[in-house]
Swiss-Prot record:
InterPro entries: SfsA (IPR005224), SfsA_C (IPR040452), SfsA_N (IPR041465). Belongs to the SfsA family. GO terms for molecular function: DNA binding. Coiled coil: none annotated. This is Sugar fermentation stimulation protein homolog. It holds the Pfam family SfsA. It comes from the Archaea. PANTHER family: SUGAR FERMENTATION STIMULATION PROTEIN A (PTHR30545:SF2). CDD domains: SfsA-like_bacterial. It comes from Methanosphaera stadtmanae (strain ATCC 43021 / DSM 3091 / JCM 11832 / MCB-3).
């Protein structure tokens, strides 16, 4: 996936969960919409380079901000911070058969309703067998270990529990975690931040729900971000009851 026509600014502050202040090339302070509601404390550091996309239709749509935050620099990496691209990226990877375990599947419906929730994708294989797929985005990496979530997520826990329910009916289910950091070599649930989600993810894994942390490499080239599939990372769960 390519996200083009980007501009670089300097991150200043985060007035609220969905807005940042940045300094543009003319040193003017401007607001931008931040689509990722996570804590991001290890990334949102003053004077850090941030990539932004100008939204031509911001007046017509009644937006208060002219820009969307796309990515932020961390060491020598660009980290995708715009979660609205997660499902678009997964859709592209499925359609181009780049995820080996899903190469026999196609997208039947996005945003499929289940009880009072919506699961990101309903896939079907060549024999019409369904697979319910939930997508999560992971930006937190400590040393070379990717960790999710970076903030407590009751909604995420609920999604995983629902996938376990579906799996118990004999239907394929999967959590696809997009690891959006070039330095990641393995994945571990973030027990310190959300023990309930982490234990639920482990239970789902044991029950047969497929948990795939898919590393995505990011490159900045000609004012564009290029996102490419790398590989499925190994998962490091804690021993149960510890």
């Amino acid at each position: 996936m390519i996200i083009d026509n980007l501009t670089i600014g300097k991150y200043i502050s985060r007035p609220n969960r969905f807005t940042i202040e940045f300094k543009d090339k003319d040193k003017a302070i401007t607001l931008a919409h931040l689509h990722d509601p996570g804590r991001l404390k290890e990334l949102l550091i003053p004077n850090t380079d941030v990539l932004l996309k100008y939204i031509n239709t911001y007046k017509e749509t009644g937006r208060k901000t002219k820009y969307d935050v796309i990515a932020i620099k961390n060491k020598n990496n660009w980290i995708l911070l715009n979660s609205s691209y997660h499902n678009k990226l997964v859709e592209e990877l499925i359609n181009t058969k780049e995820i080996n375990s899903l190469e026999n599947f196609h997208i039947d419906k996005p945003e499929i309703k289940y009880k009072n929730s919506r699961i990101d994708f309903l896939l079907k294989d060549d024999k019409n067998n369904p697979l319910y797929l939930e997508v999560k985005g992971c930006t937190l990496v400590e040393d070379t270990t990717a960790k999710f979530p970076d903030a407590p997520t009751k909604r995420g826990k609920k999604h995983v529990e629902e996938l376990m329910e579906i799996h118990e009916k004999g239907i394929f289910t999967m959590v696809l975690i997009l690891v959006l950091h070039n330095d990641a070599d393995e994945f571990k649930p973030n027990y310190d931040t959300d023990i309930d989600f982490s234990q639920t993810l482990h239970e789902a894994y044991i029950s047969g729900v497929k948990i795939y942390p898919l590393k995505i490499n990011t490159e900045l080239k000609n004012n564009s971000i290029i996102l490419k599939k790398d590989r499925i990372l190994s998962i490091k769960f804690k021993e149960r009851n510890k």
